[in-house]
Structures are given as structure tokens and as C-alpha cells.
């Protein structure tokens, strides 16, 4: 075998052939970018979806009380104290999961308000009577309009509210002891000191 036989001669690539290669290359690259973006999105924590309302005043609203409760909930009620607003429903399985933690927060003296989302009045009242009522005030958002204004994706969701009625934090999904201890309670303590 001589040195000349190891080299092949290639004719310059025609324009048609270059277009054909490019036509196959672009979709492969686009698919790769799509797969990477999808993989990145799947690995994000859905509880950390940023809210456009962070740092802004709570939306203006006024809700009647849940059946059997004396006090409804309005935006005016969220001024003066650092508080939590918990969006819940009697039909929500995850709400039942976090409920004992809300009862503990009430026992610890924290101000926790409830926003009952798209619920049957009798079911909401029965649920609170059965599992306990951790809320200082509870508004019935029967049609879900107020929850939409708050940017609620589903239940449960919990908001930390500053003394001057601004949204400081949004937690999506059921509260956990770990989440309370690592994020929500330290934030509330800091806001109380301000």
C-alpha cells in the first residue's frame, strides 16, 4: 500500500448537497434544544414558580365568611399584622395533608387567614368543623375570582403578607414542616422585626 492510496479525492460539495445536509441538520439541532429545554423545565421545583405579585399590594377584594363563620376576609384585613393567607378547599386532598401544620401555627399565635376556593358552602363548613378551624378570618371565594387575582394555580397555596399588606412570599402546594422551618417562619420573623 503506498502513501497515495490512503488519501481519497473528494469533489467539492455541490450547492444542492449542502442544502440537503443543512435541511437535515437544522431539525436535529432544534430537536436537541427542545429536549434540553424540556429536561430543564422538568427538573425545576414547581413550588418555586415566581409570582409577579411578590412585593406588590394584595389585590383588592372583599369576601363573605364561610358558612357558620362570623368573619369574612378582605384586603383591608391584611394590613397591620404579618400574616399568612392559605388558599384551601374541602375537596382538596393536599389541603388535608397540610391542615395539622396550620392548626399548630394557630396554636403558636400566628395570624393565619383562609381563602376557601370554589367550594360548596356546606362542605367547607363541615370540613372546618371536622378538622378544626385554624383561620382568624375565612373568606368564601365561591367562583374563584379572587384566587385568579392572586395568581393561584391550584390548591393549596399559601402567601406571606407583610404588615403593610404586600405579598412577600408565595408557596405552591401543601405546607411541610421543613418548608415552614426553612423559609416561611424565618421570613415572617424578619418581617415582624421590620
Where on the chain are the PLM-derived regions?
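Hydrophobic beta-strand core positions in alpha/beta domains
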Residues: 84-86, 114, 160
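Structural microenvironment flanking redox-active thiols in thiol-disulfide oxidoreductases
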Residues: 96-132, 142-148
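A short beta-strand-turn-helix
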Residues: 61-84
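Hydrophobic alpha-helical transmembrane segments of integral membrane proteins
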Residues: 23-24, 96-97, 152
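Thiol/disulfide oxidoreductase modules built on the thioredoxin-like
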Residues: 129-134, 141-192
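Short gly/ser/thr-rich secondary-structure transition/capping motifs
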Residues: 43-45, 64-71, 138-141
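Short pre-active-site segment immediately N-terminal to redox-active cysteine/selenocysteine motifs
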Residues: 81-83, 87-91, 154
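N-terminal targeting signals for export/organelle localization
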Residues: 1-64, 194
Amino acid at each position: 500500500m503506498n502513501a497515495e492510496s490512503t488519501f481519497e479525492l473528494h469533489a467539492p460539495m455541490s450547492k444542492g448537497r449542502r442544502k440537503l445536509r443543512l435541511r437535515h441538520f437544522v431539525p436535529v439541532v432544534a430537536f436537541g434544544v427542545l429536549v434540553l429545554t424540556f429536561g430543564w423545565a422538568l427538573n425545576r421545583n414547581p413550588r418555586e414558580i415566581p409570582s409577579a405579585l411578590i412585593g406588590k399590594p394584595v389585590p383588592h377584594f372583599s369576601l363573605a365568611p364561610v358558612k357558620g363563620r362570623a368573619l369574612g376576609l378582605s384586603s383591608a384585613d391584611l394590613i397591620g399584622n404579618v400574616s399568612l393567607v392559605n388558599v384551601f378547599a374541602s375537596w382538596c386532598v393536599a389541603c388535608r395533608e397540610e391542615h395539622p401544620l396550620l392548626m399548630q401555627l394557630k396554636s403558636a399565635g400566628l395570624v393565619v387567614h383562609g381563602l376557601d376556593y370554589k367550594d360548596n358552602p356546606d362542605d367547607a363548613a363541615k370540613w372546618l368543623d371536622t378538622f378544626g378551624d385554624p383561620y382568624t378570618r375565612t373568606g368564601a371565594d365561591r367562583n374563584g375570582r379572587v384566587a385568579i387575582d392572586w395568581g393561584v394555580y391550584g390548591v393549596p397555596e399559601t402567601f406571606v403578607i407583610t404588615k403593610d399588606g404586600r405579598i412577600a412570599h408565595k408557596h405552591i402546594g401543601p405546607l411541610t414542616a421543613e418548608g415552614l422551618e426553612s423559609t416561611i417562619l424565618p421570613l415572617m420573623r424578619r418581617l415582624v422585626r421590620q
